[in-house]
Amino acid sequence: MKKTVIELQNIKRNFQVGDETVHALRGISFSIQEGEFVTIMGTSGSGKSTLLNTLGCLDTPTSGEYLLDGVSVRTMSKPQRAVLRNRKIGFVFQNYNLLPKTTAVENVELPLMYNSAVSAAERRRRAIEALTAVGLADRLEHKSNQMSGGQMQRVAIARALINNPAVILADEATGNLDTRTSFEILVLFQKLHQEGRTI
């Protein structure tokens, strides 16, 4: 039986906008098992970003229960959520979120900078391994401005993999890419899924 990586139970998220209460999430319940590939779709304003922010421990629900890899998230403090997020979640964003004046290796190493148990040599080794896994072994020392959009997204995916996260969250990961490059990135996600990653 596969392990449950994400479990949401009756999640609600309300925002106060002036005198009005906006119900962004209304009683969302679902679970994601280890190794699943899940897509969340909906119209603009349907709560996708709010849900992704909740799943990514960037925001907390108004009510309900969220378990990430068996850990209850809703009552955690911001610093506790930051540690959990760094250890359990790999993020891939539409705009890559790479540091412009740093190399591919340095960008990928970033999540490990906050883990004192990992030496500088181990950080570099793991970053090179992750970049090789996404097909960028020949771009290790290239900076963002020396790479194409597809290459930058591959760096972002390598960075998401560096901590061996329980889940990879991708927010419109192909939104800024042309059709051919988008297809290549989706093929890469499919390859990661076939290797047992939860996406």
Predicted features, each with a name:
Residues 3-199:
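ABC family nucleotide-binding domain
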